[in-house]
Structures are given as structure tokens and as C-alpha cells.
């Protein structure tokens, strides 16, 4: 049975991208009004109401034992085909193709960094949470830190947080909230979604990827940070050093989706070799 994960707002609505720049890219940005935008707003309204310190803490416990399924990376890639992504309503091809498209875009630009190619294949695997009953607002969309006041570049910031109980709690409603200045993003509780799930899963299964890969996975949907320039008060020097890597990955995530489909079967042996190198065998999900 296919599960409708809906449009990923991170790919549909980007108010902080220069429209002229967007016009030179693929037509993924041709969603700016009408019912789709209404659905995106509703998704963010639900997300910004329910993503709290308590909610995120409970989700980390719920998924933290990684006892939902045992499977390989390639089996998880295949599961993406059970997700219906309405952000591409006119392009009827399996979601797994986007994983290979992203990976191949990175491979062409960075042929000497095989670990980076693998990140392209892996980056959306956390969306399988939708197959386990998670609502869209807890799977996709832009992420942000909980436990402190949302900053200006968070999408729909001024119109979607009114019902979030954390903002009525003095511990969580200031710019720093429950954090210390420059505490480092590794010490920050991020909103729950496919980024955070996969990051935690990779740590649990001891992927032998470099730290740049973990940053790309955990923060590729953290647009208020890597594109909006916010939340610098929480960053350590390491975070700032890693920021260009996340920004580099983001280019391929957004702009490699197109109807020219890769020959997945011919690519599979190469990527299986990378999996065997960095995250082999049956893993805990």
C-alpha cells in the first residue's frame, strides 16, 4: 500500500530563494499559489504548533531503540517507492529515483569524494517514518531548534507558532531558550523529521562516514540556518566550519530532480560498493 507523504515543503515553498535564481533552475519552484500552497501552510501550522521540547523528546525515545525493522540500505531505498510525493504531481516515477539523481549529481561534481555520493543516496531515507504512521509535519519540511524562540527566517514564522505551548513557557521563549551561547548544534534539540531520524539511525548503526556526512544528513532541511543565516548564537566554530558542506549538498538535493531518469540498475553495483564500504549489512531502523 502506498502512503501519501504529501509535498515536501522544503522543495515546494522557498520564500528565501532569489526568484531570478530559481527561474534558472528546474521547475520545482512553480508552486507559489493556490491549493498546494494552502496545504503547505497547513503543514507548517501543524508542525509549528506540535513540535515542542516534549514532543521531540518523546519521538527520540520512541524511535531511539531502532526496533521498527531490520533491513539493508538498498531495501530502504526501495521502500521510498511506497511514498507518494505530490511535490512532483506531473512526473510519475518512483521516489527512489530522486535518491539516485541526487547521488549522481554529486558524483559528477565531486568525483573524488565517494562518501559524498553515498550521502546523496541516503539523505531522504528517514521519510520511511511515514510508512510507520507519522504525519507529514513530523517527517518532511524545514527543521528548526525547539526549546528557544523561532527566528525570523523560519517559514511562516509570524503566523504559525501562536498555539505552540513552548512559547508560553519562559524557559523556551527567549532567543537562547534552554541553551547556552555557542553551545554547538550537537547539543541542540532539533524538530523531529526525516533528517533527525536518519542522523540518529546512522549514529546507532555506527556508519563509518566522515563528520561532514552526518552534518549534511542532520541539517539539510535546516533552512533557517544554512540559507536564512539565523541561529548563529547557538553555533560552535565546528558548526560554522561545516556550514559550507551543508550548503554544497543542498544544491544537489534541490536541483537534480528532473524527468531524465537514471539507469538505476546500472548504477546499483557502484552504490552497493559504497554501502559495503561505509554501512554494510542488515541495519536496525
Swiss-Prot record:
Keyword Kinase attributed: no
Lineage: superkingdom: Eukaryota
Location in the cell: Cytoplasm
Record text on cofactor binding: Binds 2 iron ions per subunit.
EC numbers, comma separated: 1.13.99.1
Residues holding Fe cation 1: 98, 123-124, 253
Tissues expressing this chain: Kidney specific. Renal proximal tubules.
One GO MF term: ferric iron binding
Keyword vocabulary terms for this entry: Cytoplasm, Iron, Metal-binding, Oxidoreductase, Phosphoprotein
Coarse class of the protein's main subcellular location: cytoplasm
Recorded GO CC terms: cytoplasm; inclusion body
Phosphoserine: residues bearing it: 33
CC cofactor: Fe cation
GO biological process: inositol catabolic process
Record-linked SUPFAM superfamilies: HD-domain/PDEase-like (SSF109604)
Metabolic or biological pathway, per its Swiss-Prot or TrEMBL entry: Polyol metabolism; myo-inositol degradation into D-glucuronate; D-glucuronate from myo-inositol: step 1/1
Binding residues for substrate: 29, 85-88, 127, 141-142, 220-221
Substrates-to-products reaction catalysed: myo-inositol + O2 = D-glucuronate + H2O + H(+)
Oxidoreductase keyword on record: yes
Family classification: Belongs to the myo-inositol oxygenase family.
Protein name per its UniProtKB record: Inositol oxygenase
Taxonomic source organism: Mus musculus
Gene: Miox
Amino acid at each position: 500500500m502506498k502512503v501519501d507523504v504529501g509535498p515536501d515543503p522544503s522543495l515546494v515553498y522557498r520564500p528565501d530563494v532569489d526568484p531570478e535564481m530559481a527561474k534558472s533552475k528546474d521547475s520545482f519552484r512553480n508552486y507559489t499559489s493556490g491549493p498546494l500552497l494552502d496545504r503547505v501552510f497547513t503543514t507548517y501550522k501543524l508542525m509549528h504548533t506540535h513540535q515542542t521540547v516534549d514532543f521531540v523528546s518523546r519521538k527520540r525515545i520512541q524511535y531511539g531503540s531502532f526496533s521498527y525493522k531490520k533491513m539493508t540500505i538498498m531495501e530502504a531505498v526501495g521502500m521510498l517507492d511506497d511514498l507518494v510525493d505530490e511535490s512532483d504531481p506531473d512526473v510519475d516515477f518512483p521516489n527512489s529515483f530522486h535518491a539516485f539523481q541526487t547521488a549522481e549529481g554529486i558524483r559528477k561534481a565531486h568525483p573524488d569524494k565517494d562518501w559524498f555520493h553515498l550521502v546523496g543516496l541516503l539523505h531522504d531515507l528517514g521519510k520511511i517514518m511515514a510508512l510507520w504512521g507519522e504525519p507529514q509535519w513530523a517527517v518532511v519540511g524545514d527543521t528548526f531548534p525547539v526549546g528557544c524562540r523561532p527566528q525570523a527566517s523560519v517559514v511562516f514564522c509570524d503566523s504559525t507558532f501562536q498555539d505552540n505551548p513552548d512559547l508560553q513557557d519562559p524557559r523556551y521563549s527567549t532567543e537562547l531558550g534552554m541553551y547556552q551561547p555557542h553551545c554547538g548544534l550537537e547539543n541542540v534539540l532539533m524538530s523531529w523529521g526525516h533528517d533527525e531520524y536518519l542522523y540518529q539511525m546512522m549514529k546507532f548503526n555506527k556508519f563509518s562516514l566522515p563528520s561532514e556526512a552526518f552534518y549534511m544528513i542532520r541539517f539539510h532541511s535546516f533552512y533557517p540556518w544554512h540559507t536564512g543565516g539565523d541561529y548563529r548564537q547557538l553555533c560552535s566554530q565546528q558548526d560554522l566550519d561545516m556550514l559550507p558542506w551543508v550548503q554544497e549538498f543542498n544544491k544537489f538535493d534541490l536541483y537534480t530532480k528532473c524527468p531524465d531518469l537514471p539507469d538505476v540498475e546500472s548504477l546499483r553495483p557502484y552504490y552497493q560498493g559504497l554501502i559495503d564500504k561505509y554501512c554494510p549489512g542488515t541495519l536496525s531502523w
